[in-house]
């Protein structure tokens, strides 16, 4: 079981680890402070004490809001992409435009999808989905 990201004309399949790596790369491309904060999200998953976990996420979420204010809303759509549920979400064409501005000049040869498959998802495949979301006006989704 994993994540399928799809637009009107394209799709990619990834495991949850690949999806996390993809979103981490988008965070890195967005801004250094967004990247550093996004990497800390995993820390909360390691907290077993309920009160510690609640305190961590209260502070963590406040920092997300602070970052959004720092960038005067220019990164709001990117932050939405980073923090939407792993299980199911939709990004409209406006979100696609914001994400595309961050990722358009980047490419790599990392396997984000299932490496044994001939259609293993790469970053270029994700860019096609985001661009298709803009061109079609339908955005993209994952589940």
Language model: regions and residue ranges:
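Acidic (Asp/Glu-rich) sequence patches and key acidic residues
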Residues: 1-143
